[in-house]
Amino acid sequence: MSTILVLGGSNGRTLEKLAKKRDCQVIFHDGKNHGGVKKTFRSVIKKCDVIVVQKGACGHVSIDVAKEYAKKYDVPLLFNQGFGGTGALEIGLKHLQVA
């Protein structure tokens, strides 16, 4: 089962419901740094197959840390221009089907 990390927004429960219907797993992080994101991001990025950043709902620091770890652990990093959970999930699933 594929795992998609979605960064940004506030729709974690909705994403989990949508993921169950699509036979994949979602890890959700709101993208806020809460005083430090490196440790948190490192652990979740190691567990996922693709990262989707919701640009409209994620801060620059979080995006920069996600880029750093995506490169380090060779995990594809994709961007959703808005902040809708359905769009983020679709982008991740499309990438996984092509890869």
Curated annotation (Swiss-Prot):
Q: What is this protein called?
A: UPF0751 protein BCE_A0020
Q: What are the alphabetically sorted keywords of the record?
A: Plasmid
Family stated for the protein in its record: Belongs to the UPF0751 family.
Q: Which domain of life is it from?
A: Bacteria
